Amino acid sequence: VGSEMCIRDRLVPARNFPVEVLFLRDDDIPESVASGVADVGIVGLNEVMEKRCPVGILKKLGFGKCRLSLAIPQNIDYQDRNWFSGKKIATSYPGILSDYLHKNGIVSDIHVITGSVEIAPGIRLADAIFDIVSSGSTLVSNRLKEVETVVESEAVLIGTDSISSEKRGILD
C-alpha cells in the first residue's frame, strides 16, 4: 500500500491568523527557510548547526530539549575524549562531530548512519556513537554510556534578515 503526499497536504492555512503552516522533515527546515520557501521555521538547534544554512535564531522556544553526545559501550574504561582517537564513530550529525573532533585535535573515522545509530557498536559497525540523547534510556538499552556532551539543543524559531516588517509584526 502506498500513497503520495502532495504539497496541498503539507501546506495548511491557520484559522483566525494570517499564516500558512508548511509541514516538512526537520532536516529540510533550515534550507527551506534560508532559500525563502518558508519565512520562519521551528526546528531543533542541532539541525540548524548541522545544516549550516544562513539563518538566524529568532528565539529559543524552551521545549524539545536534548543533547548531542558521544557514547561508548558500558564495559569500556573511559578516561577522557582522547579515547576517540583512531576510533570509528557512527552518527547522523557528521558536521557537528567533525567540528568537535577537529577542535579537540582528535582524528577519528566518522561513519554516517541515518537512523538507529545506537545499534552500531553492538553490531561492530562502529566503536562509538554520536547521537541525540534525551533521557538516556535508549543508550542504556543498547548497553552504551554517555561520556561527552557536545551540544545542548532545543527547539528554536529560525528566520532570515529578508523577512518583511509586516511578517515580523506577526511574529511579535
Language-model features, listed with the residues they occupy:
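Ligand-binding pocket segment of bilobal, Venus flytrap-like solute-binding proteins
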Residues: L11-A14, A120-P121, F130-L144
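Pocket-flanking alpha-helical
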Residues: D27-S32, V37-C53
